[in-house]
C-alpha cells in the first residue's frame, strides 16, 4: 500500500511538472537514492514507487543507490544522467536540497524533484512529501494515553516546515487525550 501511495504521488508530480501536451516518451526519470532499494524503509518505498510509475506510465527510469548527501557526489551522479538524456531527476533525501537548487539553475530544461525539502523555484525545481503528520498525530495520541509522568520527549532533526508539522501533529495528539501532558523537543 505504501508503494502504491508513493507511486501515485510520483505520477501526480510528473503530471503537473510535465504538463498535458508532452508524451511520456519525452521524459526519462532518474532517481538518486541515499540507501539501498531493499533497505526495508525509505529508499525501498521510493523504489517501489519508481517501479509503480514504470508499470503505470511506461516512462524510462534509472536509479543510483548509496549516494551520500554530498554536493559533489550528487552532482557527479545527476550530471551523468543528464548527459544520458534524463530530464527528470529525483533526489530522495534532505541532504540533496541545496545542490539540487543549484543544478536547477544550471539545467533549466531538467526537472528537479526533491523529497522532504522546502525550497523550489517557479520553473523546474520543487519538493514533494506525503502526509507524514497524520501518523505523527496518532503517535501523539498513543504517547499521551500511556505516559505516567505527563512529560513526553520528541527528538527532531532540522527546524524546517516538514519537521515542525510533525511536532505540531504529535503535540496535538498528546493534548487530545492528555491536556496535562507536556512535549519537550530535543534537536539532534
Where are these regions (language model features)?
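Flexible loop/hinge segments that line or gate small-molecule binding clefts
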Residues: 105-130
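Periplasmic-binding protein-like
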Residues: 85-93, 113-115
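Short, low-complexity disordered leader/linker segments with a strong preference
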Residues: 1-27
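Short, well-ordered beta-strand elements
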Residues: 27-34, 60-62, 151-153, 182-183
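An alpha-beta-alpha
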Residues: 50, 136-185
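Short beta-strand elements in bilobed, periplasmic/extracellular small-molecule ligand-binding domains
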Residues: 56-66, 178-188
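Extracytoplasmic "Venus flytrap"
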Residues: 30-49, 53-56, 62-74, 94, ...
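Short, well-structured alpha-helical segments in soluble
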Residues: 71-86
Amino acid at each position: 500500500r505504501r508503494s502504491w501511495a508513493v507511486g501515485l504521488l510520483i505520477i501526480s508530480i510528473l503530471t503537473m511538472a510535465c504538463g498535458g501536451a508532452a508524451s511520456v516518451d519525452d521524459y526519462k526519470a532518474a532517481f538518486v537514492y541515499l540507501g539501498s532499494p531493499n533497505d526495508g524503509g525509505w529508499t525501498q518505498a521510493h523504489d517501489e514507487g519508481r517501479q509503480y510509475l514504470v508499470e503505470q506510465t511506461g516512462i524510462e527510469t534509472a536509479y543510483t543507490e548509496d549516494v551520500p548527501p554530498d554536493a559533489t557526489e550528487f552532482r557527479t551522479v545527476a550530471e551523468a544522467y543528464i548527459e544520458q538524456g534524463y530530464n527528470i531527476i529525483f533526489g530522495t533525501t534532505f541532504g540533496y536540497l541545496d545542490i539540487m537548487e543549484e543544478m536547477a539553475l544550471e539545467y533549466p530544461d531538467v526537472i528537479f524533484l526533491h523529497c522532504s525539502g522546502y525550497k523550489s523555484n517557479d520553473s523546474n525545481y520543487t519538493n514533494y512529501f506525503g502526509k507524514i503528520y497524520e501518523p505523527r498525530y496518532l503517535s501523539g495520541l498513543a504517547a499521551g494515553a500511556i505516559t505516567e509522568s505527563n512529560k513526553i520527549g520528541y527528538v527532531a532533526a532540522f527546524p524546517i516546515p516538514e519537521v515542525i508539522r510533525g511536532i505540531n501533529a504529535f503535540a496535538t495528539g498528546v493534548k487530545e487525550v492528555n491536556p496535562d501532558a507536556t512535549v519537550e523537543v530535543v534537536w539532534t
